[in-house]
């Protein structure tokens, strides 16, 4: 019994210490920073939720986060990029808030990169000459309305981009490692895309005179709702594409891939024995 007494005292002390442990302060802290800025490059990291708002009159950043994160929030400029991050690894309590709203006025160029399960929202229609948009490592964006002369979109590692409404001169879309892109593309000149490793690109509507698509490693593209004059295709690794072409359709099908096409184009496609091209 005497031997058990120290153990019992230790257990009681441990329970007391646990019960007295303070819960984190979840009070919301709100700040306005970077007023009247000329920033055009934004890096969103570590699960931050950032909303970009087109604002023709003002440019500033509103921050909102749980008070216990005060010493860990890291929002600042690094090499012309405005970073939304934390300065060290920290366990984030359930219900924690760490988000920002970025008001952006008219820009010639806009670069947005989201990493590590961050969430992007874009409110309003953005008009820029040059747009570069990246979603990395399971990041998400559910609205993307952009008019741009040149636009580059890149998704990787399970990232998702929905609600695309693009109007512009040229556009490229790359999606890799189980990523998904869905929306409408109105392209005046050339649309180029590369999709790989179980990824998807689904285009619900729009227009484009020419397109070049590369689909690999069991990935899927569906462009049946967009009538295209000239298209080149490269399908490999059991991939699948559905297209709508009016004049010329050229390219290669390899390793058990399948190409479905609408329209009556002139076809010049090299097809491996285990691949298939079919009209619909």
Model-derived features: where do they sit?
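Bacterial Sec-dependent N-terminal signal peptides
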Residues: 1-30
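Short stretches within intrinsically disordered, low-complexity N-terminal or propeptide regions
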Residues: 5, 15, 19, 102, ...
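Short, surface-exposed interaction patches in beta-rich subdomains
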Residues: 164, 172, 178-280
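Acidic (Asp/Glu) and glycine-rich low-complexity loops/linkers
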Residues: 20-136, 143-156, 162-175, 184, ...
């Amino acid at each position: 019994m005497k031997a058990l007494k120290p153990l019992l005292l230790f257990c009681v002390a441990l329970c007391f210490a646990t019960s007295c442990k303070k819960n984190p302060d979840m009070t919301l802290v709100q700040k306005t920073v970077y007023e009247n800025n000329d920033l055009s490059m934004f890096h969103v990291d570590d699960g931050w939720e950032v909303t970009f708002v087109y604002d023709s009159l003002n440019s500033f950043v509103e921050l909102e986060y749980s008070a216990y994160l005060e010493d860990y929030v890291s929002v600042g400029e690094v090499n012309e990029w405005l970073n939304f991050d934390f300065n060290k690894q920290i366990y984030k309590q359930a219900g924690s808030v760490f988000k920002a709203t970025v008001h952006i006025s008219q820009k010639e160029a806009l670069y947005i990169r989201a990493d590590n399960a961050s969430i992007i929202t874009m409110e309003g229609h953005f008009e820029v000459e040059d747009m570069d948009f990246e979603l990395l490592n399971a990041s998400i964006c559910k609205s993307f309305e952009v008019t741009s002369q040149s636009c580059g979109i890149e998704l990787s590692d399970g990232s998702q981009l929905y609600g695309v409404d693009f109007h512009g001169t040229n556009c490229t879309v790359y999606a890799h490692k189980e990523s998904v892109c869905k929306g409408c593309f109105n392209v005046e000149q050339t649309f180029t895309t590369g999709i790989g490793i179980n990824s998807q690109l689904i285009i619900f509507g729009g227009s484009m005179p020419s397109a070049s698509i590369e689909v690999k490693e069991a990935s899927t593209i569906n462009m049946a709702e967009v009538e295209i004059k000239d298209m080149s295709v490269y399908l490999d690794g059991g991939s699948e594409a559905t297209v709508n072409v009016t004049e010329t359709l050229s390219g290669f099908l390899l390793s058990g891939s399948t190409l479905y096409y609408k329209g009556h184009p002139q076809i010049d496609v090299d097809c491996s024995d285990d691949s298939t091209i079919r009209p619909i």
